[in-house]
A protein has these predicted regions:
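Intrinsically disordered, low-complexity segments enriched in serine/proline and basic residues
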Residues: 4-5, 9
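Bacterial N-terminal signal peptides that target proteins for export
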Residues: 15-30
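Bacterial N-terminal signal peptides
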Residues: 29-40
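A cross-kingdom marker for long, charged
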Residues: 43-378
């Protein structure tokens, strides 16, 4: 498998006119309003607001020669070995722990779902970064690193605020990391919930929530954009459609919200929008780019395997659009097929629909790695 070098690259809903209002949307809306009135888009002055902020800002994870099952399991075990007894008890949970589906993107997070980054020392944080950079691609690690740093910009003058900032993110490992037997990893907090499952040389990433606020920020003189591709690739797909295709794809002239986010495991929305069966080759290529902006969070060969699966499902997929179809517009979209649900929605708080973003990736046939065991036997 490929050698990789880590390169750093660049939540809250409101009621939709078409989609059902879920409990998650209510909670997200309330949280979003709290954030909207307190956001400070300037980077914290002077020193870092927390040790996790310092480490995430400055530490470059060590390289790995491959992203095979043995390397991933070794990195997970190295992280667990770095913890004392108390912290390890928080981080290491049974494979089928009831905490696994309790992930949330809404602050504050309860203490049961893993070890808190703010409770780790510098070496432990670096080992956690090494682990995340091994089980994710550079694109995926960039999100896992940059979303907590973006959340630092929501702190009031850089001061501690429960549920916000890089120190209030949680890392959990379910089961015993092994190159042969099932185990899982969860990294969650405000605007992020990554659920990875492993079984032999197969892995999955469902369900995964990715969001950010603000959309971009400055770090070390560089512009960081945690969600760089999700909006432009989706917009490019919509703009590639013919007039009649756009009419079929468009559900409402107003942006909708996520309907398959936190607390919605097992929910499959009704397929809406344009059938992708008659897309031209150029449009199919753009659709694959949209899928890659999500699936590409998986490391190399795992992303390629998943994209190959999805390519065979294009004829069964639907593409739905809400809102205006121009750059900067307050829009949302959904791509849905037999084994994929992808949702994207801006939140339009403070008059900028792209400064607060939500997205969701699910494989309803493989939630928390449900079908990995079967694949391992095939």
């Amino acid at each position: 498998m490929e050698s990789s070098t880590i390169e750093i690259v660049g939540l809250h809903s409101s009621r939709s006119e078409h989609d059902p209002l879920t409990m998650n949307a209510l909670v997200c809306t309330a949280s979003a309003l709290i954030v909207a009135v307190s956001i400070s888009v300037a980077a914290p002055a002077g020193n870092y607001p927390s040790l996790p902020s310092k480490v995430l800002s400055n530490y470059t994870p060590s390289k790995v020669d491959s992203h095979d099952s043995e390397t991933m399991a070794n990195r997970a075990n190295a992280f667990l070995s770095s913890l004392d007894k108390k912290l390890r008890a928080q981080a290491a949970l049974p494979l089928n722990s009831p905490e696994k589906p309790k992930w949330t993107n809404v602050p504050p997070r309860g203490p049961q779902g893993g070890v808190r980054l703010g409770d780790l020392n510098e070496k432990q944080l670096e080992t956690a970064c090494d682990l995340l950079a091994t089980v994710l691609s550079p694109q995926g690690y960039g999100k896992a690193r940059n979303i907590p740093l973006a959340d630092d910009r929501l702190l009031r003058n850089g001061q501690r605020r429960p549920g916000f900032g890089a120190e209030d993110y949680w890392l959990a490992i379910f089961g015993e990391p092994s190159p042969d037997t099932p185990w899982a990893l969860q990294f969650d907090g405000h605007h992020i919930a990554i659920n990875l499952a492993f079984h032999g040389e197969r892995m999955s990433m469902s369900p995964t929530f990715i969001g950010t606020q603000p959309r971009e920020f400055q770090l070390g003189g560089k512009k960081i954009v945690p969600m760089e591709k999700e909006a432009p690739t989706g917009l490019a797909l919509f703009q590639s459609l013919t007039g009649s295709q756009k009419k079929k794809a468009t559900i409402r002239p107003k942006r909708a919200n996520l309907v398959a986010a936190a607390g919605r495991d097992g929910f499959v929305p009704d397929p809406l929008g344009l059938s992708c069966q008659n897309l031209k080759n150029e449009q199919r290529a753009i659709l694959m780019n949209v899928l890659k902006s999500y699936v590409g969070d998986l490391p190399g060969a795992h992303a390629e395997y998943r994209l190959k699966e999805l390519r065979t499902e294009i004829d069964q997929m639907r593409f739905a659009w809400w809102g205006p179809g121009e750059k900067g517009g307050d829009f949302s979209y959904r791509i849905q097929g037999p084994s994929v649900i992808i949702e994207y929605a801006g939140q339009d708080l403070g008059g900028d629909p792209h400064n607060h973003l939500h997205s969701m990736y699910r494989d309803p046939t493989n939630e928390y790695g449900a079908r990995l065991g079967k694949k391992a036997k095939d």
